[in-house]
Amino acid sequence: MFDINLTHEQQQKAVEQIQELMAKGISSGEAIQIVAKALREIHKNDKKTPDN
């Protein structure tokens, strides 16, 4: 696992996404997992460089 540094705005957006999922009946733990996985995928794709 690795750390992802998020801006305050990105953190707020993640919280909103978690709250939206919870409003749809998803548990808080599962909502956090879903959003965290999405953030890791985005971060992983951002780290790729043409040299790889």
Swiss-Prot record:
Top-level taxon in the UniProt lineage: Bacteria
InterPro entries to which the protein is assigned, alphabetical: UPF0181
Disulfide cysteine pairs (residue numbers): none
Cross-referenced Pfam families: UPF0181
Family of this protein: Belongs to the UPF0181 family.
NCBIfam families: PRK05114.1
Identification of the protein by name: UPF0181 protein NTHI1697
Protein's organism: Haemophilus influenzae (strain 86-028NP)
